[in-house]
Amino acid sequence: MRYTLLIFVLSLCTAFTQEVVKEGLLDPITITATRFNELISDVPYSVDLIEGRDILEDMPRGFPSVFASNPGVQVQKTANGKGSPFIRGFTGFRNLLLIDGIRLNHAAFREGPNQYWGTVDPLIASRIELIKGQGSVLYGSDAIGGTVNVITKDSSPLSYEENRSFVEGQIMYRGSTAENSHTGRIEGLVGIGQKTGVLMGYTDRSIGNIRASGIGELPFTGYSEHGMDLRIDHYFQENVHGIFSFQKFEQNNLWRVHKTIYSKSWEGTSVGNELRRSGDQSRTLAYAQIKAEDLEGPFQRIHANLSWHNHEESRLRIKANQKTDFQGFDLDSFGSWIQMESDTALGKITYGTSYYQDRADTFRSDLDKDGNVIRKRIQGPFGDDSTYEQLGFFVQDIIELNDRFDLNIGSRFTHIDANIGRYENPQTGLQDQLNNDWDNLSNSLRGIYKKNDKLNIYAGLSQGFRAPNFSDLSRLDSARSNEIETPSPDLNPEKFLSYEIGSSFDDEKLEFGISAFYTDIRDMIVRTPTGRLIEDEYEVIKKNGSEGYIYGLELNTSYHINDRLNVFGALAFNDGMVDTYPDSSLLVRSEPVSRLLPVTTNLGFRYDLSDSQWVELSSIISDRQDTLNTRDRSDTQRIPPGGTPGYAIFNFRYGLQLNEQTLLTASIENITDQEYRVHGSGQNEPGINFIFGASLKF
């Protein structure tokens, strides 16, 4: 607890300041909170907005890193390229990721931190919205800790005069020393003003082995990734907008090093025994959307979507005894939704329906040391020849009770069908199949009181649920250190109820935001040891019935001392207990929630040297996390004995806007070359890191 006093003292020093959502933006807008454009100050949620300009200045090395300085978010990395944000105590499939309102979550998402958020290129985003604790009313299953919506760049034909042709481009670069990384992106923009625009982009990123302070180079932490994207915007009329988009992103040679003999012990962590565990993954998304606004009749606005999403993953593992296996999956997700909005005497009503169907094939082959197939298994990481369908109907009404108080009421009905065509029965070792379905009704009630133009107070409660997916029902693959998870076909949905109260204040100089939350957990699905040993790993299965809670506090502050100097700070912590099965006796024990966010503080200032130059000094201060449950303590490859040490990281950035077309940035991250690891991660973070970025428009 050595950093606790420092954290709270520094936090009190900035107790009347709040970090600006976007510098210079007077009325930031959110789409995700209510499914239509709304001022952030008018929604009864905790909303974090990351603008494209922020991404361009920071040039993060991957999508999860975008959230590294976000209060209340802990970006765990099982391995380099495999970041998984924890939002209000939840990660993986208990957070929902959207791209332009389309679910990236699919039925193959596995328990705990996973690598799937790494398939999003942050450089395609015009902004990223994070709604914390939103619940399941608007978007369905999974949105427990938070909902993230990546709003992609459009081709902006409305920014140009009618019938005027335009051609533009942009080149971006980022290089760093401690990762030996290089990122390049090129964009091209063509179109006809007020009618049609086409935006094309390509990103290539090469990441070398990390150089960590104290323990040196981390072998096999390097990887490569690249992506392409296309977006076409066409205005049929001034109020009717059509969109077609295509995105493809690939990651290659991602090692899970902590499982192998090449990992390095730190603060007493154990070293894996596998000779290799590496994989590739790719994601493809194509969609068409139509938006119509200012309509006459019962609907004033309509937004509809058709999408196809493909995700492929493969993994090669060589065990200590030379036994080798190659496995993976190929999943197609077909999605459609439509939402309508009506301005009525009963309020602004949003209602609609959504349907997603996931189809997946999986494989696993056992190989000899020469790479020859000696056995083909019944399934891959989860059941083969599987389908998963989600049908939902939702309604939301925002009622303006008076000039100061708005009430937000919502409800959603969801029906889910799961069909596992083939899976390996853990008891018999023979092929089996399963069919299951579930219904859920989730509700939300929230209100916001606007004291005046500067101050508001909001409160509410939101129900959420997460239905069992392919991975829950039929997984046959590694879990944590020295564990293997086997199929668990008899599961039911998890249920959550989140309570939240918060407030924000905003005037010309001071901004302040605070939110407190409490999430009640019912029937959560948890891994449970059986006592069996399978292929040198301890078997775990999944069970419903875990009950518990998570609560926390988030504080953001910022103060403009003058036109050039802004100081900012943030404070966040989580705590909670949940029922667990620590051993094969099946006796229930209440233990701390796994991988809890330690008390974390962000502090810094930004000074504009001139209209074209700025400097920023920031810090991330994290307390020691020694509140562990049984499975945390047994995860010895990732969590040191007794817990993860605290740390204080300081970063410096400089920016120079040479002209309207050219931006140059230079940064020093981890100035003091601190040895540190984000709690629950499988590797240490880079030591002192020199970063150079450039953007040129033409």
Per-region residue spans from a language model:
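Outer-membrane beta-barrel translocator/receptor signature
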Residues: R110-E111, I124-S126, K132, V137-I215, ...
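Gram-negative outer-membrane beta-barrel transporters
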Residues: E400-L407, H415-I416, F517-D520, I541-R631, ...
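Acidic, small-polar-rich N-terminal luminal/periplasmic segments of exported/outer-membrane proteins
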Residues: G24-Y160, I501, H679-G680
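Signature of Gram-negative outer-membrane beta-barrel scaffolds
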Residues: T350-N452, D477-R480, D583-V588
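Surface-exposed extracellular loop regions of Gram-negative outer-membrane beta-barrel proteins
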Residues: E250-N252, K259-S265, E312, R359-D361, ...
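Outer membrane beta-barrel strand-and-loop segments of large Gram-negative receptors
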Residues: F329-Q339, Q390-G392, T486-N492, S498, ...
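Outer-membrane beta-barrel "beta-signal"
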Residues: R446-I448, G502-S504, P686-F698
